[in-house]
Amino acid sequence: MSPQTETKASVGFKAGVKDYKLTYYTPEYVPLDTDILAAFRVTPQPGVPSEEAGAAVAAESSTGTWTTVWTDGLTSLDRYKGRCYHIDPVPGEENQYICYVAYPLDLFEEGSVTNMFTSIVGNVFGFKALRALRLEDLRIPVAYIKTFQGPPHGIQVERDKLNKYGRPLLGCTIKPKLGLSAKNYGRAVYECLRGGLDFTKDDENVNSQPFMRWRDRFLFCAEAIYKAQAETGEIKGHYLNATAGTCEEMIKRAVFARELGVPIVMHDYLTGGFTANTSLAHYCRDNGLLLHIHRAMHAVIDRQKNHGMHFRVLAKALRLSGGDHIHAGTVVGKLEGERDITLGFVDLLRDDYTEIDADRGIYFTQSWVSTPGVLPVASGGIHVWHMPALTEIFGDDSVLQFGGGTLGHPWGNAPGAVANRVALEACVQARNEGRDLAREGATIIREAAKWSPELAAACEVWKEIKFEFPAVDVLDKAKK
């Protein structure tokens, strides 16, 4: 027998394959305050017990592999392994479970969303023993949160920078999203800001294409911002999309935006990646820029109920990585978003502390300690008739963005902006007077339209426009 063989035998190594549940299913385990907790929606293959499936998820997303390895004896599995500590059947489903997994904090690099996701939502999602797997929620411990900077500035600092309080902020995505020259693009920005909007926005796929290079767009938009500010006396901004093919190019664009003196830049955080996003967030805090986040590609990840990752997890990840705004659906517009679920992750973005709330799909109590909040952005297929519902659903700490609902106005861009500003001010005043926006919303808009011809014209154009399709992702309680 060789010395190597003798060493393996002396530590009790036994080659072969054993059930995951023997090592990674630990129902007696009490999670530590420092553990990262995950709630997975697990759909096992037929014949795979729920305990084995949950344990497999814990193993393959932490220290485990498909067979016993002798190097297990060179470390402490009890210290580093993930543990499936609780399993609940999903109501209304025959073979689907919520499996709760606890991960020791030492498994993750400090301040790195990239590393956290590489482990928790890595290769395990292609595991053959599972028909489907979805990460529903994470509990991020305070000890890990404190290793992140988080949003560059947060809600209160943004309001102070803009000197705007007591109402949602108003925005607009410039349309058509692709094809305009930089000068015509800047003209549209100016008209919308002059009409009463707080922000205008690059669409997510506006980067630096042949028809409009980024530097030209930045210059014309900055000119539009300063001209609109001079005419209105209000602070204005345009989300200049700094997303680029490399991190170096992205930062170069952000540097140029800062040199122009504009207040805010933008990033597509999922297509750009968490490493790039965190780098940009650090630059924005150091240089006084607000950071608007678009979630392009999110529905590829989060829309299917049984597989992928819920947006509430992506929202938590963004708050760690850094962003002052993030798109969060509208509930009433053209994009997917069930009301209770949307309000659940809106709370996660804005509040310092959220409790477990099954009615909103929140699986864990979450403390954000001193991490600044993020403004949710409602955007996508909304117009003036939606204003009462949006004001009631999202409240003051939000951004309401009307792209087609501004630039589609029959009289032009500036009247479209006027219509939205009048509608918003009317809804905020009515709410402050104690009126019920949900019940009286249409009446409030009609009353305001009597003295605003711009709003009256908008009401006429969009009076029949609705997007009434059932949400794909709904709460499990709906099946009971």
Swiss-Prot record:
It is found in: Plastid, Chloroplast. It comes from the Eukaryota. The active site is at 175 (proton acceptor), 294 (proton acceptor). GO terms for cellular component: chloroplast. The modification N6,N6,N6-trimethyllysine is found at residue 14. Substrate binds at residues 123, 173, 177, 295, 327, 379. The modification N6-carboxylysine is found at residue 201. GO terms for biological process: photorespiration; reductive pentose-phosphate cycle. Mg(2+) binds at residues 201, 203-204. Its EC number is 4.1.1.39. The record marks 334 as: Transition state stabilizer. NCBIfam families: PRK04208.1. The basic functional RuBisCO is composed of a large chain homodimer in a 'head-to-tail' conformation. In form I RuBisCO this homodimer is arranged in a barrel-like tetramer with the small subunits forming a tetrameric 'cap' on each end of the 'barrel'. PANTHER family: RIBULOSE BISPHOSPHATE CARBOXYLASE (PTHR42704), RIBULOSE BISPHOSPHATE CARBOXYLASE LARGE CHAIN (PTHR42704:SF15). Heterohexadecamer of 8 large chains and 8 small chains; disulfide-linked. The disulfide link is formed within the large subunit homodimers. Belongs to the RuBisCO large chain family. Type I subfamily. This is Ribulose bisphosphate carboxylase large chain. It comes from Mollugo verticillata. The gene is rbcL.
